Every structure is written in C-alpha cells, then in structure tokens.
C-alpha cells in the first residue's frame, strides 16, 4: 500500500462508500440539500447536490484534502515553487492573468512585469492588424490569419475563439492548423490570398515537428504565389523562445512573442499563445478573459476548502474514480458556443493526470486520471446518454449552461434548459420497476408483456452530476470556467501525489515518431524494430496493401 491508501481517512472513505443511501432518499430526507450543496463564485454557480454524498462524505473528503496538505500545495504553486519536480520548474500560468502590480519572482525576475510587457506588445500588434495599418508585401491590409500550432498552442486558442464567437470584432478571419496530415493545411489554404494572409507560428522551440512542417508548407505556398524571401517578415510572426531559429526562418525579431518555461502548453492560452483570440475579440475582451481567470485564481487561493469550487469538483472526481471505480467523466455543454470545451478539458485533465508514479517515483496503487469526454446538449441525448442512464459503468457528469443565450430565438433556450435540468434529474432519480409498470397500466399489452417491457424501462438512477450555470457566456465567465477546471485538475493531482505538469508519455511519442520517420524515409533499416512496426513500415514504403 502507498502512503495515500494507508491513510486513515482514505480507509474511512472506502468503508463509507459502501454505506450511502440512494440519492432519491438523500433528497427526500434533506429538504435543504440544494441550498446546502451549492455555491457560487466568479460569476459561476455550482450545484453539486446530485452527487452520491452526505454531510459525512463531505467531511471525510475535506479531511483527506487537509491530510494530504492540499492547502500548502496550493500556496506553493502560487508562490512560484518548483512543484514540477521532474523538470525543476515553477508552475505559474496564474501569473499570466495576474494584475500589473503583482510581484512574482522567478530566477530573480519579476515575471508579472514580463507578462505585462508582452500584453502591451500584443496590444500594439492587434491594433496594427485590426486597423489595417499592417500591410502585406503588396501594400494590402491583412484579412486572414492562419494560426499554426499543436496541442495547447492549438486547442486553447481554437476552442476559446469558438466559444467567444459573439465577441468577434469582424475585422479578421482566423483559421487554425495543427494536424501534420497535409490535408489539413491544404484545405485551410484554399481560397486564401497570400497578399492578405498572415501566419502565426506557435512553438516554444520553433522545432515542434507538426508545427514546423505546416509552417514550412505555408511558407512554400506563400513563396510559390509570387512573394520573395524578404516578404516573409510581413506575413509570418512567431510565438517562440527560439529567436535565432525564428529569425533564420525570416521572421522579424520584433514580431517574435515570448514563451516561458514556467507555463505548460495546455495552460498557455493566457499568454501570447492566445494571440489569435485577441485578434478576433480585441484586447479589451482578451483582458476580460484574463480577469475572469484571475478572479477564479483568487477564489481558489483564498477560499476555505469547504466553499472552494475547484476543490469541491476535484474531490468529487477523486471520490468516484477511487472509491466507485469510475473510469471516465463526461462534460456536457448546453450551449453551442461551448461545444469544443470537452475536447479542451480532455487534454487539460488527461495530459496532466495520466500518470502512474508519485512525485517520489513510487508506483501508485490507485486510479489516477479518468478518461474525459463529452459533447454538446441536446445532441448527446440522442446518442451516448443512453449509456449514462442504463449502462453498467458509473460515469459522473458535468452539465454546463448559461442562463441567458446570445441568440434568444423563440422557445429554443427554454427547451435547451428543460433538457439540461431534466437530464440531471433523470440521472439522479431513475425509474423503478414499479414506476415503469404503472406507466404501462393503460397500454394494450398483456400482463406478461407489461412486466417484460417494465424491466427494460427501469433506470437505476443514483448517477452523479454537477451543474454549472452562468448568467451569460462572456469573456470573463469563460475565463473563470476554464480556470475552474485547471484548478480542479490540480486538486486531484495534489491529492494523488503525482506531477500534473510534465508529460513524458507525449515526449516518448515524439522520440519514437522521429525514429520511425527515419526508417520510413529509408535513412535507417526498418528491420531493426519489432515485427509489427517493421511490417507496417514496409507496407508504407511499397505504397499498397
């Protein structure tokens, strides 16, 4: 047993998990349950009453958090301690949205001042493009921006830009490219005019394989349309730490925006990686996005655990994964603009907490990161919700919905809300055999048929969910929502005693991918690998099955 599973509180939770009543009973005996098990902060409202939890459950979970020094770990992160112990790095994405007068010292430098300088540089750049003063090589203003990245430098900007579609200023179109599949960039370049297109290349090293390959293809397309190498500086900018490589490529040093080691890719949308967001919604709205996230940072850092929204959500995820064997968690967004959030939270959580050793290198003997998945309501109700209601696996759910729509057309939003709330009720309440049989009482079926169909209509209920509401989707509430999930991810990792801020599995994939590339291009012998890999490489070389 590990140190965590040996703790008395952990073992008490194991025993307690087997004694809980069905949620139907909890609601019937606790008339104040909704009031007692809901909270709000930073423009968000969290109803966590539809969870398999009593007051004793909550007390034990909060005690586990305290026993594992969660509060001191939160302080360590905000203080800039090197909590990423495998890479000896601070974890300070929170500094990217800190106010200008904040002082956070890393390696002798006030990094908040550096962040503010970058924001000022971003403001100048955004103004020059949106005003039309930035001209391409033929003197025309820029109309289209192509953002090239991968992972966090792609998914964050794309999903946030999509979510904040109502706030686009309309001066620019933005296109996102990530996949190294040539089809992706080929399709994006169709219909674009090289004279009015600008590329933003985001790679800390300026050498990420997919990003560099796509950028070189973009450059070849640009030069192939009549531009010259000297024109590259007017149509390519970079977000990178490698100034030398970027300038060698042809990018003006003044048009290179910095990245820092204390920000991981999946936490980087708040930095210059978010440049595409700012180009679409303007810097004022981008700063509102940062302000909303900072407000959640303050809530997380300063609120007692018992009222702390990220702590509550993180504890529930741990509760189901470790004590009910839940292997996945579904995120359901009842707002079309938020349809991409499940994919963003998937990367955030699974890349952070998909770990199997503790900080000191001990193998864990408990489940860590679950599979995160989901989609938008009400589409999912006609697909995978069936599994949520009657499947054999326990799958906790988060429902996310604004109370007010940006597009209040007819009865659409009230129907959306009725479906959202109805799903949470159905998951909690279920339907008993007796209830199903009673519903069939007036049908023309005989008694034997009624009894059979009733068995198929039984739903066990007791399926947990959280509901997160906001008045309206704004840059501020979106910032708070994303920061909520960032900190929820941290809470789990801190209690599991794992490093949520490295990604060695990703690094191994890159390393082996490069080795296979050498063999695919025949610069290395394919027969040195396992027989499966050898066979696949040889099939690729011959080009047919």
Swiss-Prot record:
<comment type="function">
    <text>Catalyzes the reversible isomerization of glucose-6-phosphate to fructose-6-phosphate.</text>
</comment>
<feature type="active site">
    <location>
        <position position="382"/>
    </location>
</feature>
<dbReference type="GO" id="GO:0006094">
    <property type="term" value="P:gluconeogenesis"/>
</dbReference>
<dbReference type="InterPro" id="IPR035476">
    <property type="entry name" value="SIS_PGI_1"/>
</dbReference>
<keyword id="KW-0963">Cytoplasm</keyword>
<dbReference type="InterPro" id="IPR001672">
    <property type="entry name" value="G6P_Isomerase"/>
</dbReference>
<dbReference type="GO" id="GO:0051156">
    <property type="term" value="P:glucose 6-phosphate metabolic process"/>
</dbReference>
<dbReference type="GO" id="GO:0006096">
    <property type="term" value="P:glycolytic process"/>
</dbReference>
<dbReference type="InterPro" id="IPR018189">
    <property type="entry name" value="Phosphoglucose_isomerase_CS"/>
</dbReference>
<dbReference type="InterPro" id="IPR046348">
    <property type="entry name" value="SIS_dom_sf"/>
</dbReference>
<comment type="pathway">
    <text>Carbohydrate degradation; glycolysis; D-glyceraldehyde 3-phosphate and glycerone phosphate from D-glucose: step 2/4.</text>
</comment>
<keyword id="KW-0312">Gluconeogenesis</keyword>
<dbReference type="InterPro" id="IPR035482">
    <property type="entry name" value="SIS_PGI_2"/>
</dbReference>
<keyword id="KW-0413">Isomerase</keyword>
<dbReference type="GO" id="GO:0004347">
    <property type="term" value="F:glucose-6-phosphate isomerase activity"/>
</dbReference>
<comment type="pathway">
    <text>Carbohydrate biosynthesis; gluconeogenesis.</text>
</comment>
<feature type="active site">
    <location>
        <position position="510"/>
    </location>
</feature>
<feature type="active site" description="Proton donor">
    <location>
        <position position="351"/>
    </location>
</feature>
<protein>
    <recommendedName>
        <fullName>Glucose-6-phosphate isomerase</fullName>
        <ecNumber>5.3.1.9</ecNumber>
    </recommendedName>
</protein>
<dbReference type="GO" id="GO:0048029">
    <property type="term" value="F:monosaccharide binding"/>
</dbReference>
<dbReference type="InterPro" id="IPR023096">
    <property type="entry name" value="G6P_Isomerase_C"/>
</dbReference>
<comment type="similarity">
    <text>Belongs to the GPI family.</text>
</comment>
<dbReference type="GO" id="GO:0097367">
    <property type="term" value="F:carbohydrate derivative binding"/>
</dbReference>
<keyword id="KW-0324">Glycolysis</keyword>
<dbReference type="Pfam" id="PF00342">
    <property type="entry name" value="PGI"/>
</dbReference>
<dbReference type="GO" id="GO:0005829">
    <property type="term" value="C:cytosol"/>
</dbReference>
């Amino acid at each position: 047993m590990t140190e965590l599973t040996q703790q008395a509180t952990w073992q008490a939770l194991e025993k307690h998990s087997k004694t809980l009543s069905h949620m139907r009973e909890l609601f019937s005996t606790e008339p104040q349950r909704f009031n007692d098990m809901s909270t709000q902060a930073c423009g968000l409202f969290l109803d966590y009453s539809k969870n398999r939890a009593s007051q004793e459950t909550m007390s034990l979970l909060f005690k586990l958090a305290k026993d594992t020094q969660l509060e001191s770990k939160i302080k360590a992160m905000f203080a800039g301690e090197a909590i990423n112990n495998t890479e000896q790095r601070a974890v300070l994405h929170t500094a990217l949205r800190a106010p200008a007068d904040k002082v956070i010292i890393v390696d002798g430098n006030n990094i908040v001042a550096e962040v503010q300088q970058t924001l000022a540089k971003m403001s100048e750049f955004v103004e020059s493009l949106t005003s039309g003063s930035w001209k391409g090589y033929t003197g025309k203003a820029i109309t289209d921006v192509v953002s090239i990245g991968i992972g966090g430098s792609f998914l964050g900007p794309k999903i946030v830009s999509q979510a904040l579609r109502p706030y686009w200023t309309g001066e620019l179109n933005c296109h996102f490219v990530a996949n190294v599949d040539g089809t992706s960039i080929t399709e994006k370049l169709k219909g674009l005019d090289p004279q009015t297109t600008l590329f933003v290349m985001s790679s800390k090293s300026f050498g990420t394989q997919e990003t560099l390959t796509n950028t070189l293809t973009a450059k070849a397309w640009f030069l192939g349309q009549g531009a010259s190498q000297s024109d590259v500086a007017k149509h390519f900018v970079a977000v990178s730490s490698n100034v030398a490589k970027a300038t060698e490529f042809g990018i003006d040093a003044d048009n290179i925006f910095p990245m820092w080691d204390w920000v991981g890719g999946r936490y980087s949308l708040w930095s210059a990686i978010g440049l595409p967001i700012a180009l679409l919604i303007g810097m004022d709205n981008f700063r509102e996005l940062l302000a909303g996230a900072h407000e959640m940072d303050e809530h997380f850092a300063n609120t007692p655990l018992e009222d702390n929204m990220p702590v509550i959500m993180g504890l529930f995820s741990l509760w189901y994964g470790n004590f009910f064997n839940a292997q996945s968690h579904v995120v359901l967004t009842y707002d079309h603009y938020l349809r991409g959030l499940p994919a963003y939270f998937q990367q955030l959580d699974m890349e952070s907490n998909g770990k199997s050793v503790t900080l000191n290198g001990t193998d864990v003997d408990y489940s860590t990161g679950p599979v995160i998945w989901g989609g938008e309501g009400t589409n999912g109700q006609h697909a995978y919700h069936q599994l949520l209601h009657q499947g054999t696996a326990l799958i906790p759910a988060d429902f996310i919905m604004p109370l007010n729509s940006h597009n209040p057309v007819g009865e659409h939003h009230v129907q959306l809300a009725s479906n959202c709330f109805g799903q949470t009720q159905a998951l909690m309440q279920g339907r008993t055999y007796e209830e199903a049989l009673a519903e069939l009482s007036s049908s023309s079926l005989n008694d034997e048929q009624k009894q059979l169909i009733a068995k198929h209509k039984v739903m066990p209920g007791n399926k947990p969910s959280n509901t997160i509401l906001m008045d309206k989707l704004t840059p501020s509430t979106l910032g708070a929502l994303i920061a909520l999930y960032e900190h929820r991810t941290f809470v789990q990792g801190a209690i599991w005693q794992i490093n949520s801020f490295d990604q060695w599995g990703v690094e191994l994939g890159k390393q082996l991918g490069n080795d296979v590339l050498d063999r695919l291009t025949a610069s290395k012998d394919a027969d040195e690998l396992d027989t499966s890999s050898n066979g696949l490489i040889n099939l690729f070389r011959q080009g047919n099955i």
